Amino acid sequence: MRPELSQYKHLSAGKVREIYEIDDKHILMVASDRISAYDFILDTEIPDKGRVLTAMSQFFFDTIDFPNHLAGPADDPRIPEEVLGRAMVCKKLNMLPFECVVRGYLTGSGLVEYKQTSSVCGVELPEGLVESSQLPEPIFTPATKADIGDHDINVSFDVVEERLGEARANQLRDASIAIYKAAAEIARDRGVILADTKFEFGIDEDGTLVLGDEVLTPDSSRYWPLEGYEAGSVQPSFDKQFVRNWLTGPKSGWDKDSGLEPPALPGSVVEATRERYIEAYELISGQKFCQWIGSCV
């Protein structure tokens, strides 16, 4: 359900977030408890998910040395009380039309493409890689942004260059890989593998490239436990892969290619997903989720 914030104009709704206008230079980005999978927004919500996404984004925005769109603290007085802990005050940006995916390990759609072409988004990879193999170096595999219900489309770096120009495309790729490497080191030091992640960037009024949207959350990233990691099989995860696995497993009775809406998630899957999200935040940030604004009632 969308928060009714009478003091602000509602601008747009995404799969998970609601965007409100504060003034001509700032927006309020509110993370809901909605969860999406296979381009569907599920009917079932995950309690506290929006708070985890906001807390995780805040942690990495504060930690990673790169310009970002945050324009106030987590308890900024411009944040209405009813969404405190799940909202951020952000600068308005001219968002770039690409999802900036960085992969350090081979899994998901990247693995499917590799099996067909020995490459991912035009990046040639060595022979003999298997599910969950670590790549020799992280690779930049951009995708076009899709509307709700549509699929993001993986594209080559040449497409980004054609759209944005060589200089901006190189800046986007280099920034994405550098941020991934910094975050992967933080996660690994805490016993977590950052397998891949997705960034979104925009341009501010000064022409500066700025990191926007959410960053390095369990929604936008694949996080695996370092302990027990071994290439060749699907890894346990701290992200919404658990939901995807249930939906495509025998217990759901759902075919993702049927065109039908997914079923409601059972309580056990909801709670297990909530626990995984919270565990990811606590492991990586070193902070207790209960200490995050509005999380203990």
From Swiss-Prot:
Superkingdom of origin organism: Bacteria
One function term, GO molecular function aspect: phosphoribosylaminoimidazolesuccinocarboxamide synthase activity
Catalysed transformations (reactions): 5-amino-1-(5-phospho-D-ribosyl)imidazole-4-carboxylate + L-aspartate + ATP = (2S)-2-[5-amino-1-(5-phospho-beta-D-ribosyl)imidazole-4-carboxamido]succinate + ADP + phosphate + 2 H(+)
Annotated EC: 6.3.2.6
GO cellular component term, pick one: cytoplasm
Keyword Transmembrane: no
InterPro entries: SAICAR_synt/ADE2_N (IPR028923), SAICAR_synth (IPR001636), SAICAR_synthetase_CS (IPR018236)
Pathway: Purine metabolism; IMP biosynthesis via de novo pathway; 5-amino-1-(5-phospho-D-ribosyl)imidazole-4-carboxamide from 5-amino-1-(5-phospho-D-ribosyl)imidazole-4-carboxylate: step 1/2
Entries under CDD domains matching the protein: SAICAR_synt_Sc
GO biological process, one term: 'de novo' IMP biosynthetic process
Keyword vocabulary terms for this entry: ATP-binding, Ligase, Nucleotide-binding, Purine biosynthesis
HAMAP family: SAICAR_synth
Family: Belongs to the SAICAR synthetase family.
Protein name per the record: Phosphoribosylaminoimidazole-succinocarboxamide synthase
Upper taxonomic lineage: Bacteria, Bacillati, Actinomycetota, Actinomycetes, Mycobacteriales
